[in-house]
Regions:
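Glycine-rich phosphate/pyrophosphate-binding loops
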Residues: 51-52, 133-143, 427-444, 459, ...
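A short, small-residue-rich loop immediately preceding and capping a beta-strand
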Residues: 25, 61-62, 112-115, 143-163, ...
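N-terminal capping segment at the start of a domain
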Residues: 12-27, 186-188
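A short glycine/serine-rich beta->alpha loop
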Residues: 3-4, 21-30, 58-66, 109-120, ...
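Non-catalytic terminal/interface segments that mediate subunit docking, oligomerization
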Residues: 312-458, 536-546, 552-553, 559-562, ...
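Thiamine diphosphate
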Residues: 95-107, 125, 131, 135-139, ...
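Cofactor-binding active-site loop characterized by glycine-rich and histidine/acidic residues
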Residues: 35-176, 392-393, 425, 532
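Terminal amphipathic helices with adjacent charged low-complexity linkers/tails
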Residues: 58-59, 242-254, 258-339
Length: 665
């Protein structure tokens, strides 16, 4: 065998790290890291702007491993370039409490920009990051001071491009002309079930060309010169995103398994590991990296220099544009603007006095009109339902390819990509995105919502048309199980306000919450403002509170939310002639549960009979009403009819609630 050149030798270090880590864990995916090692070496050593000593540097290039099963490629890169990922962490790959989980996880491993694993979502995150970069550059950059100026790179595989979200996200990226987005496609022709020619035969360059992307096809993914030339060409194109299609061999270096599905998702085994070491001319022990290879890979000094140069630029920028510099720092730190809370509380009190009867989707629009002037970082959007979701406001300006000084994205009918893109925007920093669709279409976006919760990021999800109350469109559009789906997801707050006042507090929670996503569940139909005193208004922030009672020692406690609360309150005033009643509004069960046992019992009553009323699936409320209690809810899909007819048919009018209560009691 001939002597290896330096690029190949350094790439081989990535290969053996991945191979050894998977072998020790007895599980993992060595094939992709070994196949993409040459590409990763060229990108990370010669083209990626980053600082291992400060993974949070705001002007770093973003790198997303969309094909997250190949996580050991990323962990190897982070270790070799000098991030806080030790060889002991590499040895503990896929073990409890390590910094090297099976798939990359945001917040666990320094240098990991987003959690990936569900294929395709990383691409949507990368699109979101590129959108944020372009929005912030348009807002903050001044002549001679490009303080926001970085690339977003994403690795992707066949699986990502088979997933529908890749089509949704990449189509929009092309329409928006995201010139600083580069996707590198690992075209190895293999997936778990074998050669993809049996199920994935589309012309990827032609597909992306139709989206409006620059396509660089037929790059040898094991030739450093071809890879380098392609990346340079991609960075030179600033009017459209680029996909670089690299022909690679999965499991490259394995004499017996390279190019086969058997290298994808399992350890090679002791004998093949020995064969691979011989094939790669790698004589070192497992987890042993020669010092000269560490020296060649280490990026700490270069990264420190890159950030230092930017810091000098930003210091001059701050001297010339102090207000802009301060605002940039505020947005990147996700600090609330001055006066935000006071403005929202003043608006809530005003709405309590005015007692408007409006749909909570309209209430939400009214709140956005309060937030918008105070939060230039607020970027709205909708999946082609702007007029129905009421996600625009008086200051809405559409973001287009030719105008990135806007504040509103028309996502088109792309619910999944919309949510993944918002996640990427939040992860980038500097932007607070929100967007809307109908609650029933949560299902299209479900996994991206879950990923936001898993990553503990404050994506704001606006879901209108929240029940059978939407009426004639029928059961295809009437959510039943969706609230339960959201509420049973860890680390998300789901608010279903009953009127404008509760909607203000829902938005307040969404904006002030920095560690979890918030879902705002809004009605299509008009709802009256409920009577409250000042203490009740303040108690909304606790997620659940007493809205009405005929006795401070009630025998019957009625629990309700959203559009059913008003009818429940009316029903309580009918039945209170025969039993002492309390009505409790719980707009956010997660916030309510967090108040603790003592508060919960003080609101729900320790020994009271409890009945919950909500036009959603019944099961969620069983934990509140207990075995003695009852739920007036939905246990079937809806029907097509006017909303008021359906409310009567399914038992959510005052009269039907009264009848149900008397029958139960």
């Amino acid at each position: 065998m001939t002597k290896l050149n330096s690029d190949v030798l350094l790439a081989n270090a990535l290969r053996v790290i991945a191979m050894d880590a998977v072998e020790k864990a007895k599980s993992g995916h060595p094939g992709m890291p070994m196949g993409m090692a040459d590409i990763a070496e060229v990108l990370w050593r010669h083209n990626l702007k980053h600082n291992p000593l400060n993974p949070e540097w705001t002007n770093r290039d973003r790198f997303v491993l969309s094909n997250g099963h190949g996580s050991m490629l990323l962990y190897g890169l982070l270790h070799l370039t000098g991030y806080d990922v030790s060889m002991d962490e590499i040895r503990n790959f896929r073990q409890l409490g390590s910094k090297t989980p099976g798939h990359p996880e945001y917040g666990i491993t320094p240098g990991v920009e987003t959690t990936t694993g569900p294929l395709g979502q990383g691409i949507s995150n990368a699109v979101g990051m590129a959108i944020s970069e372009k929005l912030l550059s348009q807002r903050f950059n001044q002549e001679g001071f490009n303080v926001v100026d970085h690339m977003t790179f994403a690795f992707t595989g066949d699986g990502c491009l088979m997933e529908g979200i890749s089509h949704e996200a990449c189509s929009l990226a092309g329409t928006l002309g995201l010139g600083k987005l580069v996707v590198i496609y690992d075209d190895n022709g293999i997936s778990i079930d074998g050669p993809v020619e049996g199920w994935f035969t589309e012309d990827i360059p032609a597909r992306f060309e139709s989206y409006g992307w620059q396509t660089i096809a037929n790059v040898d993914g094991h030739d450093p010169e071809q890879i380098s030339a392609a990346i340079i060409k991609a960075k030179e194109e600033d009017t459209k995103p680029t996909i670089i299609c690299c022909k690679t061999i999965i499991g490259k270096g394995s004499p017996n398994k390279a190019g086969t599905a058997s290298s994808h998702g399992a350890a090679f085994g002791e004998e093949e590991v020995k064969n691979i070491r011989e094939e790669l001319l790698w004589s070192h022990e497992p987890f042993e990296i020669p010092e000269e290879i560490y020296e060649a890979w280490n990026f700490q000094e270069k990264g420190k220099e890159l950030e230092s140069d930017w810091n000098k630029l930003f210091s001059e920028y701050a001297s010339n544009f102090p207000d802009l510099a301060q605002e940039y720092s505020r947005c990147m730190s996700m600090d609330d603007p001055n006066g935000l809370e006071a403005a929202l509380l003043e608006f809530a009190n005003s709405m309590q006095e005015q007692k408007l009867t409006v749909a909570t989707r309209k209430s939400s629009e009214m709140v956005i009109n309060v937030l918008g002037p105070l939060m230039p970082e607020l970027v709205g959007g909708s999946a082609d339902l702007t007029g129905s979701n009421n996600t625009n406001w008086s200051g809405t300006v559409a973001i287009t390819k030719d105008n990135f000084k806007g504040n509103y994205l028309n996502y088109g009918v792309r619910e999944f990509a919309m949510t993944g893109i918002m996640n990427g925007m939040v992860l980038h920093g500097g932007i607070r995105p929100y967007s809307g669709t109908f609650l029933t279409f949560l299902d299209y976006a479900r996994n991206a919502v879950r990923m936001a919760a898993l990553m503990e990021i404050p994506t704001v999800l606006v879901y209108s048309h929240d029940s059978i109350g939407l009426g004639e469109d029928g059961p295809t559009h009437q959510p039943v199980e969706h609230l339960t789906s959201l509420r049973t997801t860890p680390n998300i707050e789901t608010w279903r306000p009953c009127d404008t006042v509760e909607t203000v507090f829902a938005w307040k929670a969404a904006i002030q919450n920095k560690t979890k996503p918030t879902a705002l569940i809004l009605s299509r139909q008009n709802l009256p403002t409920i009577d409250r005193d000042i203490n009740q208004v303040a108690s909304i922030n606790k997620g659940g509170y007493v809205i009405y009672e005929s006795s401070n020692q009630p025998k019957l406690v009625l629990i309700s939310t959203g559009s059913e609360l008003a009818a429940t309150l009316e029903a309580a005033k009918v039945v209170e002639d025969s039993i002492s009643v309390r009505v409790v509004s719980i707009p956010c069960t997660e916030r309510f549960d967090a108040q603790g046992k003592e508060y919960i019992e003080s609101i729900l009553g320790k020994d009271s009979i409890r009945v919950a009323v909500e036009a959603s699936h019944e099961d969620w409320w069983r934990k509140y009403v207990g075995l003695r209690g009852s739920v007036i809810g939905m246990d079937s899909f809806g029907e097509s009819a006017p909303g008021n007819v359906l409310a009567d048919h399914f038992g959510f009018t005052k009269e039907k609630i009264v009848a149900s209560l008397r029958n139960y009691l």
